[in-house]
A protein has these predicted regions:
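Extended alpha-helical scaffolding segments used for macromolecular assembly and cargo binding
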Residues: 1-120, 124, 129-137
Length: 138
């Protein structure tokens, strides 16, 4: 629909100059727009596009983002791991999930990342690792 097209076009254009943005709140606004575009792309099952938006959103975050922008960071990282799982690109999932595990404030915030990581291990036929992680989560 037209609203989706406008969102994707606007975010694509803003991303072209995103790394040049030096003002923190403007940069975080663009990261939020990438999250919105990523969420919308996930809902439309365009997982490659979703991963691209989410990865760009992550790249816009500052070094102390987990402290200052916890909710945004958690959403970007968790959804990026999910998008990469849907794309069958498993190499980044464990690294992204490790970031969530390290910085999550509460156990519930880790669950989505654990679920994606367990599914990714299973999809790679690393069933023993998937089961071990499942038991660890329990």
């Amino acid at each position: 629909d037209r609203a989706n097209d406008v969102l994707f076009i606007a975010v694509d254009q803003l991303n072209r100059g995103g790394n040049a943005i030096k003002v923190e709140h403007k940069r975080m606004e663009l990261a939020k727009l990438n999250l919105q575009a990523g969420e919308k792309a996930m809902s439309l099952a365009t997982f490659v596009n979703a991963a691209s938006y989410l990865k760009k959103g992550i790249s816009l975050l500052y070094e102390d983002h987990w402290e200052k922008y916890y909710d945004l960071s958690l959403k970007l990282y968790s959804l990026y791991a999910e998008a990469e799982y849907c794309n069958g690109r498993f190499h980044d999932i464990s690294q992204v999930a490790a970031g969530v595990f390290k910085h999550a404030k509460i156990y519930q915030d880790k669950l989505r990342a654990y679920a994606i990581l367990i599914k990714a291990l299973g999809a790679q036929y690393k069933l023993q690792n998937a089961m071990n992680m499942g038991f660890e989560v329990l």
